[in-house]
Amino acid sequence: MKIITFSHYKEVTDDVLKDSYAVVIDLLRATSTMIWAISNGAKGIIPVEDISEARLLKRLDESVLLGGERGGLKIEGFDLDNSPLSYKKEAIFGKTVVMTTTNGTRALKKASCAKRIFLGSFINAKKTAEYIMKETLHYNIDTISIVCAGTEEKFTLEDILCAGYFVDLFIENFPDVFLDDLSLASHVLYKKFENDPHEILKYSYHYNHLKKLGFEADLEFCLRKDFVDCVCEFRNLVVEKV
């Protein structure tokens, strides 16, 4: 099994993704929020790149909720922001959410040429990795691509740290694994800080940006490991539970 990691979505190359299963990670916060929303009973998440596209879908179907952020903050006129803590069961159960974020929704769209696309986060990594391993073995897939969303088209530390956890899970279970250099680096980073990711992330840009905006509770939430059993897949333009 080959594990290929991309540091941000702009680096993604179709020739690698087209034969692989992809894991898209926007740890802080889009994929964490989408996974939590689906686990709380959202019918589906429709990721879109632009605010105008989200508003158009709302005009076409008033029953959908609008969620997302720009610069980390709720978009004017939207129902929800990008905090996982906003996606309570009573707010989203049975609903479809149209979501647009600065990085995560674009990363999902960029990965669309992969054979299958899964959402990754610390909160559901183990369950997701187990499912991917089972499916790749069954269908003879030999490449897993980890697509880090990044922040504003740049490398971001928290996504790489989470990628390292996925690499760790894959290494434990696949008998023969080839890691590209970024997969290897992400794994080394993860193993050093696996017991306290805050220890390194407290120096990182996006972590501190969210902290300054008052989202400390989101940081704690998104850095907790494996308390969600939900595996989420992006298929036919919608994020749904597998």
Curated annotation (Swiss-Prot):
Q: Which cofactor does it need?
A: Mg(2+)
Record key words, sorted? Hydrolase, Magnesium
Pfam (any one): 2-ph_phosp
> InterPro entries per the record?
ComB-like, ComB-like_sf
Q: What is its EC number?
A: 3.1.3.71
Q: Does the keyword Magnesium apply?
A: yes
Question: What molecular function terms (GO) are annotated for this protein?
Answer: 2-phosphosulfolactate phosphatase activity; magnesium ion binding; sulfopyruvate decarboxylase activity
**Into which EC class is this enzyme placed?**
hydrolase
Catalytic activity of the protein: (2R)-O-phospho-3-sulfolactate + H2O = (2R)-3-sulfolactate + phosphate
- What family is it from? Belongs to the ComB family.
What is this protein called in UniProt?
Probable 2-phosphosulfolactate phosphatase
